[in-house]
Amino acid sequence: MSWIEPIISHFCQDLGVPTSSPLSPLIQLEMAQSGTLQLEQHGATLTLWLARSLAWHRCEDAMVKALTLTAAQKSGALPLRAGWLGESQLVLFVSLDERSLTLPLLHQAFEQLLRLQQEVLAP
């Protein structure tokens, strides 16, 4: 069991999702309002991915906004990034060093991803 498993497990429980031990290196949570949240452990990094499918007519504006906001470092203290999956899936993500991972940092990263998503999708 990795030392960060209790942190990830507590985070999932805070979101109302029970976990079992041992945790998978890839956890996928379906969020009712914001799409799919994935937590992926790889090496000494934990990456949070927030993916959401968009209607085709919103894709271009969302892509430009997401890339502009993340490139301009307007996304807050954490290095948020944006990408695109397939034809219509906006992906916002942040990678965290496991050595500095805490429960408050995990919540902060998720909240910043949610705020960025809301800003990108705002009219």
Swiss-Prot record:
Annotated S-S bridges: none
Protein name as it appears in the record: Chaperone protein SycN
KW Membrane (keyword) present: yes
Annotated source species: Yersinia pestis
Entries under Gene3D superfamilies matching the protein: 3.30.1460.10
SUPFAM superfamilies given in the database record: Type III secretory system chaperone-like
Biological process per Gene Ontology, one example term: protein secretion
Entry keywords, A to Z: Cell inner membrane, Cell membrane, Chaperone, Cytoplasm, Membrane, Plasmid
Database matches in InterPro entries: T3SS_SynN (IPR012673)
Gene label: sycN
Quaternary data: Interacts with YscB to form a complex which specifically binds to YopN.
Compartment(s) where it occurs, according to its Swiss-Prot or TrEMBL record: Cytoplasm; Cell inner membrane
CDD domains: T3SC_IA_SycN-like (cd17031)
Function as written in the Swiss-Prot or TrEMBL entry: Functions as a specific chaperone for YopN. It could facilitate the secretion and the subsequent translocation of YopN.
Claim: Cell membrane is one of the keywords in the record: yes
Membrane protein topology class: Peripheral membrane protein
Gene Ontology CC annotations of this record: cytoplasm; plasma membrane
